[in-house]
Swiss-Prot record:
This is Pesticidal crystal protein Cry1Ga. Promotes colloidosmotic lysis by binding to the midgut epithelial cells of insects. It comes from Bacillus thuringiensis. Keywords: Sporulation, Toxin, Virulence. CDD domains: delta_endotoxin_C. Toxic segment of the protein is located in the N-terminus. GO terms for molecular function: signaling receptor binding; toxin activity.
């Protein structure tokens, strides 16, 4: 009631306050959200290990009970709390995802129930597998939408529900997977996803809860409502996510939530209480339970009210006489005698208040608003009421903000009152408010620390009754379910009173959930006697945030028993330097009979090691066991706990080393671990210089290679090796295989009689399916191979033996090739080639193997014999054809030189003749492998013999031409330029000088030998009217010139010059190695008619190969890309006898455009 200035009472609920009305409406509308969330938390706390009943329960509580309207309430609740309204489209999108998940999960539950009724039925197994995958895909697709940017807080409660559903689903698959028919590799992948998602979802929820709370600012109704409502709908559920780890928690687990939430202050809605959080909210503390409250009463304007109080509590496990008396809240007024109230009941569980009803009176007097509490009733679960001042007409009720399930408080309550604070406004403002603030803890946080014999008992360390010096209590990060303890120096954390209900012969092991910036030792004492001491590793670096991944659950391997049913358990830490940080969340007591994760890891490693060998005596490896798989098994062994199974770990390590040695022995590749590339000319790996060898990482245990892309497909990135013929067996199939971390446009070849070829694209860590969730680094920078990794499904097809190209969806690859007869003299061998010829291409690969797969029988044997015969037939044909081509090429090369020593060119040998001879040399087939032109082919020796002589010819030719850069391949280097001229590259890949203006001139000073004779030879073309001139002269007189015209009339030249046609005619005796005025290259050098026109490479085989073709880049070696001049170019020359040691060459024109291809000044032979 409100008292006016005339002391007339006005009903409290008639106060005109919009914010109060909003929050009253909010509480009535959104009670369903808290009720549903509390029900889910209780279900998760009470549920056992997975069974069909768990999925059914989850469906009944959440996914089968909520529709679009209910899901909208989850969204609208947070919208009002943070004052951020989302659009109808965004709300509809979120609810559509949730209802879709509900439908998919319903079908999964039906399939699970059907399978449970008939678990051995293959159809039932297939259906539940299919429904699991569809639901899993739906969640994986939908969750990112619920975490969309700028809506993370608004969607937080529904994100939590979907995340919980996903973890439940993944746990089902790990737990039931073997009986569903999933492979062990599938199950391991699902378990890795499960643990990775627990971390991801926990961090997401804690982060956005804390950010949303911080954005609200100072204490207010909104702040307390957000803290309370989202603790119930988000953080309580998140705190139980770790229990989904079925291997860490394989039996029922008893968890406790020790966090505190606050109901709104019991004041009138129009009162503004802008106080700091520190004055209202409790600092982190050891958990306590109310024993009694002493309430003091004051009076204002003749109205008695709650003016102050004292709280007397006990910590966990403490009895009478061990009380904590908190400082006085408010004032110890004496308008009425103090009232002491305490909960009543027969047991500690009954002696707890789950509800508080209050009567608030408000009135205005002398211009000041008053809001006071004049009566409160506290209810236990048996409806026993403890009343402060008898009253009637209670008008506020905490059950509106913390509802119970159903109508029976004994089974439906979720929270108990744990403390009472006090709100007092300043007496110097116009508003006068005095009211209690109630804080509550979850019912799962029991009044005792009882350790059960048949479950894993988790006890948060804040349930200690004594805090040791140097230990502090800090606010939890959000996913721990409460506050945590911290030390920065050695010593004990605290003492816990524990109760044992089982026979004292029951053995337990202790685990600790901790985070630490240092390696350290934990120890435990029971009643002052040391029970365990063990080494524990650091989990984080100094300054790191307390994220989920910083915490680790680890324990002692030695089991123990309690000697007393009521014992004191102490935990401490030592063995580290000061100023480090050590945090403990909880202690776990595990019945010794339960299989620890370490035991599971040992069993898994033993199975993996034994599965490597063909028999129990480890004589031989299984054929399908890859070198990469052996490395992974080695990692499993290395990650075993030294504390738990040191001897077994050593034994398994020796077996894995033996397996690795067997793998090396059967691998026919030299240097499979990439100790070097190009180290030995005829052995090991050969490759392009841009390939890098990198040490092992979290993917590869040993060295691996990285192949980058290339800007020119004719100069690819490559890596190759030849398998010697001596290592091969007749009529046997061999397999190349390995592991690719990622690749794009990686081509893999195996070549013998033909080429087997695959193009492999493997998405890597940046793909939709990541290889690893993280790349953790050890304390010394080494890769942490014990951290969970997400790998591709190894059951997917990893070879494409019948196709030319294959886009892999597996990191494993294999390619096989068949060997027929072997010939050590011929030494055909097998070429192994990796190549990338695109700019975007790349690859990282390792663990390469080339090994014997099986002998060839039946059809495979007949096929390889047929292929071998075809290859030999074509090889013989190639030899005949090569003899003809070689003879002609050699004659062309020999004609360039004076003698067989090849040390002097013929006097009339010109550049065109050398190019023409080079082209004939390049007509020799199979000089290099068409797949990779750096690998010599069957005709490499004769090709390189002639090509060396061509190189000599070019060198001799360059040496006798005294004009520098006469072919303009280096632009205008060495030339003096006046006016505007250009050097252009024409479509025949030649550089030409273009003189477009009559005033332009290009010249070069050349040193010569006086008294010797020279030939000036110019190849040029004139466009338009006028003449182009190339002049040679000395300082005084002795001038000659060559003129070029576009006129068709016959020109008259000096006696010492010849025309192009005359010159060409004179060269016919050298079998026409030049270009005439109107004569093309093909006419002068057509194809030899003795060579078949339909000649194809000898490895071409349509039925058995993948279409091996001649390498189009092979012609680019040396001068093979030389093409004839276009029609219209003319070559002219003159003889010149200098009288001094310097001459000048000048190029110009009178009109039009003058195009010069080359200028030569050649010393005549003596």
């Amino acid at each position: 009631m409100e008292i006016s200035d005339q002391n007339q009472y006005i009903p409290y609920n008639c106060l005109n306050n919009p914010e109060s009305e909003i929050f009253n409406a909010r509480n009535s509308n959104f009670g369903l959200v808290s009720q549903v969330s509390s029900g889910l938390t209780r279900f998760l706390l009470e549920a056992a290990v997975p069974e069909a009943g768990f999925a059914l329960g989850l469906f009944d509580i959440i996914w089968g009970a909520l529709g679009v309207d209910q899901w909208s309430l989850f969204l609208r609740q947070i919208e009002q709390l943070i004052r951020q309204e989302i659009t109808e489209l965004e709300r509809n999108r979120a609810t559509a995802i949730l209802t879709g998940l509900s439908s998919s999960y319903n079908l999964y539950v039906e399939a699970l129930r059907e399978w449970e009724n008939d678990p051995n039925n293959p159809a039932s197994q297939e259906r539940v597998r299919t429904r699991f995958r569809l639901t899993d895909d739906a969640i994986v697709t939908g969750l990112p939408t619920l975490a969309i940017r700028n809506l993370e807080v608004v969607n937080l409660s529904v994100y939590t529900q979907a995340a919980n559903l996903h973890l439940s689903l993944l746990r089902d698959a790990v737990y039931f997977g073997e009986r569903w028919g999933l492979t062990q590799a599938n199950i391991e992948d699902l378990y890795t996803r499960l643990t990775s998602n627990i971390q991801e979802y926990s961090d997401h929820c804690a982060r956005w809860y804390n950010q949303g709370l911080n954005e609200i600012g100072g204490i207010s109704r909104r702040y307390l409502d957000f803290q309370r409502d989202l603790t119930i709908s988000v953080l309580d559920i998140v705190a139980l996510f770790p229990n989904y780890d079925i291997r860490t928690y394989p039996i029922p687990t008893q968890s406790q939530l020790t966090r505190e939430i606050y109901t709104s202050p019991v004041v009138a809605g129009n009162i503004n209480f802008g106080l700091s959080i520190a004055n209202v909210l409790r600092a982190p503390h050891l958990m306590d339970f109310i024993d009694r409250i002493v309430i003091y009463t004051n009076s204002v304007r003749s109205t008695p009210y709650w003016a102050g109080h004292e709280v007397i509590s006990r910590r966990t496990g403490q009895g009478q006489g061990n009380e904590i008396r908190f400082p006085l809240y408010g004032v110890a007024a004496n308008a009425e005698p103090p009232v002491t109230i305490r909960p009543t009941g027969f047991t500690d569980e009954q002696r707890q208040w789950y509800r508080a009803r209050s009567r608030v009176v408000s009135f205005r007097s002398s211009g000041q608003d008053f809001s006071l509490v004049d009566a409160v009733g506290f209810l236990t679960i048996f409806s026993a009421v403890s009343i402060y001042r008898n009253g009637f007409g209670f008008n506020t009720d905490t059950i509106d903000e913390i509802p119970i399930e159903g109508t029976d408080p004994f089974t439906g309550y979720s929270h108990r009152l744990c403390h009472v604070g006090f709100l007092a406004s300043s007496p110097f403002i116009s508003q006068y408010a005095r009211a209690p603030i109630f804080s509550w803890t979850h019912r799962s946080a029991t009044l005792t620390n009882t350790i059960a014999p048949d479950v894993i008992t988790q006890i948060p360390l804040v349930k200690a009754f004594n805090l040791h010096s140097g230990a502090t209590i800090v606010k939890g990060p959000g996913f721990t379910g409460g506050d945590i303890l911290r030390r920065t120096n050695v010593g004990s954390f605290g003492d816990m009173r524990v109760n044992i209900t089982a026979p004292l012969s029951q053995r337990y092991r202790v685990r600790i959930r901790y985070a630490s910036t240092t390696d350290l030792q934990f120890y435990t004492n029971i009643n002052g006697t040391t029970i365990n001491i063990g080494n524990f590793s650091s989990t984080m670096d100094s300054g790191d945030d307390l994220q989920y991944g910083r915490f680790r659950v680890a324990g002692f391997t030695t089991p123990f028993t309690f000697s007393d049913a009521n014992s004191t358990f102490t935990i401490g830490a030592f063995g580290f330097s000061p100023n480090n940080e050590v945090y403990i969340d909880r202690i776990e007591f595990v019945p010794a009979e339960v299989t620890f994760e370490a035991e599971y890891d040992l069993e898994k490693a033993q199975k993996a090691v034994n599965a490597l060998f063909t028999s129990s005596n480890q004589i031989g490896l299984k054929t399908d066991v890859t070198d990469y798989h052996i490395d992974k098994v080695s990692n499993l062994v290395e990650c075993l706990s030294d504390e738990f199974c040191l001897d077994e770990k050593r034994e398994l390590s020796e077996k894995v080393k033996h397996a690795k040695r067997l793998s090396d022995e059967r691998n026919l590749l030299q240097d499979p671990n990439f100790r070097g590339i190009n180290r030995q000319p005829d052995r090991g790996w050969r490759g392009s210089t841009d390939i890098t060898i990198q040490g092992g990482d979290d993917v590869f245990k040993e060295n691996y290679v990285t192949l980058p892309g290339t800007f020119d497909g004719c100069y690819p990135t490559y890596l190759y090796q030849k398998i010697d013929e001596s290592k091969l067996k007749v009529y046997t199939r061999y397999q190349l295989r390995g592991y690719i971390e990622d690749s794009q446009d990686l081509e893999i070849y195996l070549i013998r009689y033909n080429a087997k070829h695959e193009t492999v694209n493997v998405p890597g860590t940046g793909s939709l399916w990541p290889l690893s969730a993280q790349s953790p680094i050890g304390k010394c920078g080494e890769p942490n191979r014990c951290a969970p990794h997400l790998e591709w499904n190894p059951d997917l097809d990893c070879s494409c033996r019948n196709g030319e190209k294959c886009a892999h969806h597996s990191h494993h690859f294999s390619l096989d090739i068949d060997v027929g007869c072997t010939d050590l003299n011929e030494d055909l061998g097998v070429w192994v080639i990796f190549k990338i010829k695109t700019q975007d291409g790349h690859a990282r690969l390792g663990n390469l193997e080339f090994l014997e797969e099986k002998p060839l029988l039946g059809e495979a044997l007949a096929r390889v014999k047929r292929a071998e015969k075809k290859w030999r037939d074509k090889r013989e044909k190639l030899e005949l054809e090569t003899n003809i081509v070689y003879k002609e090429a050699k004659e062309s090369v020999d004609a360039l030189f004076v003698n067989s020593q090849y040390d002097q060119l013929q006097a009339d040998t010109n550049i065109a003749m050398i190019h023409a001879a080079d082209k004939r040399v390049h007509s020799i087939r199979e000089a290099y492998l068409p797949e990779l032109s750096v690998i010599p082919g069957v005709n490499a020796a004769i090709f390189e013999e002639l090509e060396g002589r061509i190189f000599t010819a070019f060198s001799l030719y360059d040496a006798r031409n005294v004009i520098k850069n006469g072919d303009f391949n280096n632009g205008l280097s060495c030339w003096n330029v006046k006016g505007h001229v250009d050097v252009e590259e024409q479509n025949n890949h030649r550089s030409v000088l273009v003189v477009p203006e009559w005033e332009a001139e290009v010249s070069q000073e050349v040193r010569v030998c006086p008294g010797r004779g020279y030939i000036l030879r110019v190849t040029a073309y004139k466009e338009g009217y006028g003449e182009g001139c190339v002049t040679i002269h000395e300082i005084e007189n002795n001038t000659d010139e060559l003129k070029f015209s576009n006129c068709v009339e016959e020109e008259v030249y000096p006696n010492n010059t010849v025309t192009c046609n005359d010159y060409t005619a004179n060269q016919e005796e050298y079998k026409g190695a030049y270009t005439s005025h109107n004569r093309g290259y093909d006419e002068a050098y057509g194809n030899n008619p003795s060579v078949p026109a339909d000649y194809t490479p000898v490895y071409e085989e349509k039925a058995y190969t993948d279409g091996r073709r001649e390498n189009p880049c092979e012609s680019n070696r040396g001068y093979g890309d030389y093409t004839p001049l276009p029609a219209g170019y003319v070559t002219k020359e003159l003889e010149y006898f200098p009288e001094t040691d310097k001459v000048w060459i000048e190029i110009g024109e009178t009109e039009g455009t003058f195009i010069v291809e080359s200028v030569e000044l050649l010393l005549m032979e003596e």
